């Protein structure tokens, strides 16, 4: 396993409170390592080969600090729709081309400039607490979807001549 640090991982907290205890992460483009926050580590050589994504079922209720080594990934989809996800932090993901993040709480700022400089497509929706988003230096952006972020008051979009689609609504 690579050493998982704040600089090279995606970090967030999973809050298992009800009967639904399963977390699904869809990824593609390279190897990944997941620390599920309960002492279990999982290495995935080819996450795209796993139909429905990488799935983990928590046995007990509680809060778990999840870390995902994502330096090689080109796509990741993390959603808190079915299980509560909060406090998201992004590490260095230089190969990331498609980033999908939905239904996440307790995250006030996302700065993709440093961590996802080569991202081409972003889908950021239903962040209950997101106030500020920065993507002005993500020069390869082609598809931008930002929606249903009720506290979003500041976005640094910059100039993106290659953008083919921009959807920004209910923010």
Enumerate the predicted regions with their spans.
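Acidic/charged coordination and interface sites in well-structured regions
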Residues: 88, 133, 155
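N-terminal capping/linker segments that flank leucine-rich repeat
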Residues: 1-105, 117, 139
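Concave beta-strand-loop units of leucine-rich repeat
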Residues: 72, 78-84, 95, 100-107, ...
């Amino acid at each position: 396993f690579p050493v998982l640090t704040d600089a090279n991982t995606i970090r967030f907290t999973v809050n298992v409170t009800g009967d639904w205890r399963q977390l699904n992460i869809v990824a593609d483009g390279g190897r990944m390592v997941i620390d599920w926050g309960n002492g279990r580590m999982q290495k995935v050589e080819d996450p795209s080969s796993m139909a429905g994504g990488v799935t983990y079922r928590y046995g007990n209720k509680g809060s778990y600090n999840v870390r995902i080594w994502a330096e090689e990934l080109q796509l990741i989809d993390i959603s808190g729709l079915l299980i509560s996800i909060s406090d998201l932090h992004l590490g260095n993901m230089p190969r990331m081309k498609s980033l999908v993040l939905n239904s996440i709480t307790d995250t006030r700022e996302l700065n993709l400039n440093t961590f996802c400089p080569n991202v081409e497509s972003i889908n950021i929706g239903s962040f209950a607490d997101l106030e500020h988003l920065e993507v002005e230096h993500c020069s390869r952006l082609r598809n931008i979807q930002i929606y249903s972020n009720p506290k979003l008051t500041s976005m640094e979009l910059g100039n993106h001549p290659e953008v083919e689609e921009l959807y920004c609504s209910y923010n």
